[in-house]
Amino acid sequence: MNDKNFIEELRQKREEYGVTQTRLAVACGISREYYNRIEKGKQPLNDELREVIEKQIERFNPQEPLFLLIDYFRVRFPTTDALAIIRDVLQLKPDYMLYEDYGKYGYESKYVLGDINIMCSMQEHLGVLLELKGKGCRQMECYLLAQERSWYDFMLDCMTAGGVMKRLDLAINDKAGILDIPKLKEKYKAGECVSYFRMQKDYSGTEKCGSDLPKNTGETLYLGSTSSELYMCAYQKNYEQYVKNGTEIEDTEIKNRFEIRMKNERAYYAVVDLLTYRDAERTAFSIINHYVRFVDREDDKPKSQWITNDDWAWFVGENREPIRLTTKPEPYTLQKALHWLQRQVAPTIKMVQALDRENRTTILKDMIEQAELKDKHKHLLQLEKSTIEERIDTAVPQENDGIF
């Protein structure tokens, strides 16, 4: 983009966001007169100042450049009655769950609804385990929305049912690219980070990580040990989506992500804080501020007194609007199966079709007619034919009346 196009787009954004020249100039560390000359095309732009202006204008975006999600939720219930948990806590109809005679973490079986997993065991010390990973959280939000429940309500239901927290991930998503992951890595390596964490790992987008670490996430920084009960992870979400789904990097809504990953007791205390204050920003950033602070070097002072880096200060709350716990409901669809079909199977199907035409055979037709649907395929068809509302169990147990 040349300077003329950039300046015109900048002017339009500034007016759309309701930002005065003076306010933007102050944020960029220049005078209003200097900025005015830039916007009129009378002052040439160098790459460094252009980058500063691009970053600062997005901080005024009224569409909230940062938002916070629950991205992993795992809780164990002290009961062997999985169906009761499905009906009373998830408030879903078991008829829409797929039963599978295998599970994870030592559980013998599980009930599945899309990416919502309920692990089952007849051993009382294992009980029933609800696991919601990223997609599972988004799908659960569809049901919570239809039930007119919030995450806070759902967590309270889990705790009321005797739930024991096993894992909770809070994800702060950066839509404007303000959280510069490569820069954070450089500052950490340069010793410009005040932290209680003893361990740190960083990966470039081409490195293969261990089994406990996600792959293909662009530049990645881990703060704390991944085997501990609390650690943090910052990575380039747009690169991850490009590798996983082929989404163009510039078209990805979320540019960067900062995650707080908590297990067991740490997860429990985070949930208690969320339920006490119902303020996800307070919970998330009190944890972040306790454990880590990125600073700018001041060699004439002790490290603990170094000034907080401007970008980091904005990220943790200085001079920005508060962020709330939001939801991004995404119903389960056949898209994953269709994507696999398109990439892995469609070329072979097309080849067999051509072979049938050439030889006047019906190989493909015969194969489809002879194929038998497995339970998981029937389950997918059941989900496609039903609505979110139809899967909800509206009969709230009598003992829960009045809680909400």
Q: What feature does the model see in each segment?
A:
Residues 20, 31-34, 330:
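Short coil turns linking two alpha-helices in DNA-binding domains
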Residues 10, 24-25, 35-38, 334:
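Conserved hydrophobic/aromatic packing and binding residues within compact polymer-binding modules
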Residues 29-45:
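Recognition helix of helix-turn-helix/homeodomain-like DNA-binding domains
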Residues 8-27, 52, 327:
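Short basic helix-loop element that most often maps to the first helix and adjoining turn
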Residues 1, 42, 52-54:
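N-terminal flexible/basic segments that precede or flank functional cores
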Residues 3-4, 12, 16, 58-332, ...:
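Structured, helix-rich domain cores that form ligand/interaction pockets
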Residues 46-62:
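DNA major-groove recognition helix of helix-turn-helix/homeodomain DNA-binding modules
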